[in-house]
């Protein structure tokens, strides 16, 4: 039963990518239902990182590039309470979308709740090296999302599934502070069937922003494999929001001259009516697995099934809000 407090507290929710922003909005709405005050900010930097951001040297990142402006526009359109940089008031709790780069103005004496966004990058020799050298000052963000959670600076870490709880514990996170809540946007795949989208019975190709974050992407090889695996099928493309569209679409047109190409539109309705997903490293592969449709991925599908986010009918945001409330 919903328990509403009479002395609500101030909670700062730090957004990031569009997915993270939508997750935070859902969590904030649940906190408001509990009687607390949810304040939002797009991701922001401090210190030397602020100077680098001002110079445009961090625009390649997903949380500080184009998606930061999209996050701000989304917050504006929702009419939620905002406090850019969390500077206007003292907060009783902070909800983080990542701990790879933590603003240095966050209050150290209040609880921090970290929320898993989705799929993490594969663990590599380099990412393990970064983690080992972190104690000597090497920043965790250099390991990308494979190092999520390893700052250890959070009070609770809300994760997608029991499989992920085990995964993060194996990576070195404190298991006693990890809570399996499910994660918003990936906890109710069946609902996608009800969303409106004009096309039906197609193969949906979900590309990733590997090149934009300086990873290897043999894009033309991937596109040829998609073509060869799906002869005669209707193909629809959904580009990652962080991708350079002109380049990506030019490559697609070489093999798929008439295929629809989307980028800014939400992927969920497209997934709900697809017959198959072709992915690179997209977290959205989880939705295809939850729906039971065929999927391909650069990642190990058996491992993805082990990590599959809880399907709890969309209760994850409320679960996370309850974790926050217990700390207030």
PLM features per residue range, with description:
Residues 55-62, 108-115, 175, 252-262, ...:
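Active-site regions of enzymes building and remodeling cell-envelope glycoconjugates
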Residues 44, 55-62, 230-264:
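Catalytic donor nucleotide-activated moiety binding site of glycosyltransferases and closely related
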Residues 22-24, 30, 185-251:
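Conserved catalytic-core segment of nucleotide-activated headgroup transferases in glycan assembly
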Residues 154, 306-328:
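Leloir-type glycosyltransferase catalytic cores
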Residues 4-18, 205:
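Nucleotide-activated donor-dependent transferases that construct or modify glycoconjugates
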Residues 96, 263-309:
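A donor-sugar binding/catalytic signature common to diverse glycosyltransferases
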Residues 12-34, 39-188, 285:
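Active-site and donor-binding regions of nucleotide-sugar-utilizing enzymes
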Residues 49-51, 122-130, 188-193, 270-273, ...:
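Short, charged, surface-exposed secondary-structure boundary motifs
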């Amino acid at each position: 039963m919903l328990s509403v407090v009479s002395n609500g507290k101030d909670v700062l929710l730090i957004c990031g990518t569009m997915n993270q922003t939508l997750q935070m909005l859902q969590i904030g709405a649940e906190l408001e239902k509990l009687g607390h005050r949810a304040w939002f900010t797009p991701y922001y930097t401090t210190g030397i990182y602020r100077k680098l951001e001002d110079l445009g040297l961090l625009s390649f990142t997903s949380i500080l590039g184009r998606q930061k402006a999209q996050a701000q526009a989304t917050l504006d359109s929702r009419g939620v309470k905002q406090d850019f940089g969390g500077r206007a008031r003292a907060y009783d709790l902070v909800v983080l979308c990542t701990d790879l780069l933590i603003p240095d103005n966050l209050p150290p004496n209040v609880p921090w709740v970290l929320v898993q966004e989705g799929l993490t990058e594969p663990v590599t020799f380099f990412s393990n090296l970064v983690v080992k050298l972190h104690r000597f000052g090497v920043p965790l963000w250099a390991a990308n999302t494979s190092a999520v959670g390893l700052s250890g600076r959070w009070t609770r870490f809300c994760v997608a599934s029991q499989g992920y709880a085990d995964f993060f514990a194996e990576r070195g996170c404190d298991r006693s502070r990890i809570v399996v809540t499910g994660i918003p946007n990936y906890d109710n795949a069946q609902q996608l069937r009800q969303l409106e989208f004009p096309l039906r019975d197609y193969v949906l190709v979900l590309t990733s922003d590997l090149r934009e974050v300086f990873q290897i992407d043999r894009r033309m090889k991937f596109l040829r494999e998609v073509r060869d695996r799906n002869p005669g099928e209707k193909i629809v493309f959904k580009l990652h929001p962080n991708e350079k569209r002109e380049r990506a679409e030019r490559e697609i047109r070489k093999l798929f001259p008439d295929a629809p190409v989307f980028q800014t539109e939400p992927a969920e309705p497209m997934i709900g009516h697809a017959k198959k997903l072709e992915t690179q490293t997209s977290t959205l592969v989880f939705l295809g697995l939850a729906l039971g449709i065929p999927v391909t991925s650069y990642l190990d599908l058996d491992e993805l099934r082990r990590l599959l986010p809880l399907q709890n009918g969309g209760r994850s945001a409320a679960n996370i809000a309850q974790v926050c409330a217990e700390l207030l």
